[in-house]
Amino acid sequence: YVRMANGPFGCTAFAADVFARRIVGWACATTMDTGELPLQALEQAMSWAASHGGTDGLVHHSDHGAQYIGLVCTTRVGEFGMLPSTGTVGDSYDNAMAESADGAYKTELVWRRKPFQDLRDLELATFRWVSWWNSKRLHRSLGYRTPERTETEYYANQAAQAAPL
């Protein structure tokens, strides 16, 4: 939850690629409605995945929050050809990557500034933070590389291995 100047709290949902830690989908709203927030982040992630090899065989991992295991979200995951996966209840390690990204978002953006003026202000700040996260922020889990660099190196290596001798 994110503090807003006009009273209600804002909420942000992220979808990330586990391999490169890239945030591939995100959305902000003033409610955690299952028909809005997580689905918007999922739709963005699926658009990104479709342009990077497709969605078949991908796994959508989430916690047991009602917004993620509800019929609307699980139906959409299935329509994309993805496999649903949820963590075990009461196990904080099962969703550690998501918790880490959420913690970084709050530490690096949310708690460093005054409350957001409105939803548009939150969305703009989140857009800038996600762009920075993917292209500039060094991640210890990636050997102090950015998600973009990790992907670039991976695809260059794949192309080199596929090239004829």
Each language-model region and where it sits:
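Charged DNA-binding/catalytic regions of mobile-element recombinases
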Residues: 1-165
